[in-house]
Amino acid sequence: MRKIFLILSLSFFINSFSQTAVFNSLLKTHVDSKGNVNYKAFKKDEAKLQTYLDYLAKTSPKKNWPANKTKAFWVNAYNAYTIKLILDNYPLKSILKIKKKGKDAWNIKFAKVGNKTYTLNHIEHKILRKQFNDPKIHVGVNCASGSCPQLGNFAFTEDNYESKTTDLMEKFINDPKRNKISEKKIHLSKIFEWFEGDFTKNGSLIDFLNKYSKTKISNKAKISHLQYDWNLNGK
């Protein structure tokens, strides 16, 4: 019996690794170093994406998984299903154009994971944000829009989650298209307004920003927020 359990566990691990590798390969092929997505070319690889989505549809994170493994799984699922949604409606100029029965892209129930069907909002807010005190989730999940933190051209894994999200947070905060930072004035992404509480659980917002900002921000800096660019993050 123990041998059977070990064989099944090994088989699951190998399948999980190979399917994540499929998604990783797709992102590496169709997403450039700045997070721009070639959706036109990605469209031709829908069959490969579907193999990964089929894996997600029958896989549930285990309760004994380490936190980073669980976060990587759900962030990958969010991003894969967001890409699927864009491809299903391609060509389009913005994810805001997607509507189904009066619901926007984030409230359409279509993302199948472990024999359940979720909305993107449920994955982000009810699973990732609710279960984990991790503000870097906001640079992991990607909303397919210009002002979103850039989409990484890789899949997340248990081993790379911390380093990759740290790198993405540094790029996001120091990207002048998404955040304009000086010592005494900061014009921030709306993400820091919408989800301010996620970034201030262990100090002020400026404390958080200074962990990643190349420019030291004064505690008395004036804060404003930039208009959000909802144009598609690619072509």
Language model region names:
Residues 3-14:
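Sec-dependent N-terminal signal peptides
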Residues 20-235:
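Interaction/scaffold regions that mediate signaling and macromolecular assembly across diverse proteins
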